[in-house]
Amino acid sequence: MESTEEQQQPVAVVEEASPEIIFRSKLPDIAINNTLPLHRYCFERHPEVADRPCLIDGATGAVLTYAEVDRLTRRLAAALRRAPLGLGRGAVVMNLMLNSAEFVLSFFAASRVGAAVTTANPMSTPHEIANQIAASGATVVFTEYMAVDKLPVKANGGLTVVLIDARRDGCLHFWDDVMASVPDDEDQEPEEAAAGFDPDDVVALPYSSGTTGLPKGVMLTHRSLSTSVAQQVDGDNPNIGFTADDVILCSLPMFHIYSLNTIMMCGLRVGAAIVVMRRFDLARMMQLVERHRITIAPLVPPIVVAVAKSDEAASHDLSSVRMVLSGAAPMGKDIEDAFMAKLPGAVLGQVRAVPCHARPSAPNATGRFSPFSCLLVSFGLHFFSFMLALLDFASCFMCSFLIF
């Protein structure tokens, strides 16, 4: 007789791939214009918010408006095309820096010239950075003084280094050398058609954490990232309801896809203000929430736990926060409850590794109730305009369902 433990193990019903076992979202599809370059998609609504804050420096309070961000990315794109950088379609640049306005400008400037950006943690080891540069084929690195000594020495000037903060021999300075090299009348990008743009070109090349081996480059195209942004913030009933009136906290590293996609790209798409923290600090984060009346706080479970256990929350007015997103790892209900006691006016949504609604059988991240019910042990409903298949790794066939 089988033991109780054995009886409780799920059994996959495996079939060869067929249309019947491709699961479509129960939510209606939305129109997605995913043939645009990523920068055009994210900046599409900028004329409506041109004079509003786009990037707010959490350390200094300095503000760049949407019009200024658009102008500066155009200017930097013009500089990337010129000597000595000479970048174009198919080139790869590396963003090796902590959160900053320069990170955003360099990312979208690369998109404008048809290049891809590989993002890297400046706290990585020299060996890890060298491997990523070699594997990705990056020829230009945007970085900061603290990380420049970690870069490999390439013969014949094969690697151009651009520093965003201090000056150093052998390196270009972001503002004084690169941006200043472009005359005021030459900061317009050419038409993508003339540059041979294709929506299936790679625009972002973040690296995995290496949980199944060495870190691997993840090739993300203009089409795939535009689609991802649309599935989060577009449509009449967006899954993550960011608006142009929101102020979004960016305390998570932009070199990670969560911050890069959900905070930076989605925030820019809707015209929200983004408060940029160079790196996370709990006390500083709460000060910024109070000072800038932050409404959206994308976090990760360790930060959620830190807030839940902190007495500092009582010393700050956090009432402006209406939505908290937690991603990268799941959380238990006890942690959620302890955290929400500190922010009773906010909605908490857990963002999963696959596109899905924030919490099953509960309000999603927009604060709306889902019209569909599902088990609490499930990961929720998947996004609109999305199809899902379950794969049995042992057979490489798709599973039609699970029997318990």
Where are these regions (language model features)?
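ANL superfamily adenylate-forming
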Residues: P19, R24-S25, V140, M146-P199, ...
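Conserved AMP-binding/adenylation subdomain of ANL enzymes
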Residues: S226-V247, F255-I296, S310
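Gly/Ser/Thr-rich phosphate-binding loop
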Residues: R269-A272, I294-L299, A308-P371, G380, ...
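Conserved adenylate-forming
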Residues: A83-G88, V182-D201, L205-C250, V270-A272
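N-lobe entry segment of adenylate-forming
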Residues: M1-A83, V113, A193
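Structural core segment of the AMP-binding/adenylate-forming
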Residues: E2-V11, L105, R112-S181
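Conserved AMP-binding/adenylate-forming
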Residues: G58-V63, A79-P126
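ATP-dependent adenylate-forming carboxylate-activation enzymes
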Residues: M97-L98, A115-I133, Y145-V148, A272-H292, ...
